[in-house]
Amino acid sequence: MEEEKYLPELMAEKDSLDPSFVHAMRLLDEEIVKFQDSEGNKEDGEKKYLDIISNKNIKLSERVLIPVKQYPKFNFVGKLLGPRGNSLKRLQEETGAKMSILGKGSMRDKIKEEELRKSDEAKHAHLSDELHVLLEVFAPPGEAYSRMSHALEEIKKFLVPDYNDEIRQEQLRELSYLNGSDDSERGKGTRGRGIRVPSTPSRNRGGVISPAFPGRGASATRGAPITRGTISTVARGIPTPRAKAAPTTPGYRLPPPLTIETYDDYGYDDGFGEDYDEQSYDIYENNYNSQTQSVSEYYDYEHGTNEESYNHYEQEEWSKSRSTLKAPLQRPARAGYREHPYGRY
């Protein structure tokens, strides 16, 4: 009997036997394993030495059995392939090894698989074998064995019959994403309606701005010590405006009382359009004209000022203030004193 045809005949007899023939099935399995071991020993005998100096590429191949007999209801092929075969592709890229699912049950179409098994073509001879994963590596010796070891460790994780492990959950998420039903990546933001909340409390629309420091026209507290040579930021001589009921900001009115609107009554067209359309441009012009007059008075530094209202710093005051010292300092006489602090300008 030719050795090339012996193994396929053993596999064919095993498939043709009824599972009730337990002893015949056991004997056939032992014969198949014995023949495969003898073939492996022949190959090992021919390959006696490994040349690592030349660093030539070698080919390694291993067949990993898929435990379909122990777990017949679990879909190992589907777990290995993943959605659209992406899991097996990523596994090959990660390990650097070529992986192929071969053997009985590796094809989805069972009728076509049976037809190809009965054919005598050598490329379909694997359909008579047990369901397994063929690992092939073609690389230099050191790298080849390293890739094979990595591939064996990774393929072992896919042969665990667990429906809720990390690999299975990742495949389900990928499948939902590919089908377009993954809503986790789409953010659905809700927008509050009915109440308008100002973003910053510094200035409200139509409201009054609370001044943090004295503005124009504010009166300064008299009697406070004044540093010589510095210009005060408070305007002098301009009367303080009286308090008014309406805000002083031109073009704005007090907002209506805040009301909470329902979702049905609120619309995107509602806003401040009806309140501010009634104002005309004449109101803005009158406000700006009145403002220009007050500005001109503000920059007129001599308007409403009297020389008598300010203290004159002369030599007598300096001599009186230094009377308590034992030896007053002698200050050189100055050429003259300015009558008004803004005289030079």
Curated annotation (Swiss-Prot):
The keyword Transcription applies. Keywords: mRNA processing, Nucleus, RNA-binding, Transcription, Transcription regulation. One of its GO terms (biological process) is mRNA processing. GO terms for molecular function: RNA binding. InterPro entries: BBP-like, KH_1_KHDC4/BBP-like, KH_dom, KH_dom_type_1_sf, Qua1_dom, Sam68-YY. Residues 65-131 form the KH domain. One of its GO terms (cellular component) is nucleus. This is KH domain-containing, RNA-binding, signal transduction-associated protein 2. Residues 178-224, 321-345 are annotated as: Disordered. Its main location: nucleus. Coiled coil: none annotated. It comes from Xenopus tropicalis (Western clawed frog). Belongs to the KHDRBS family.
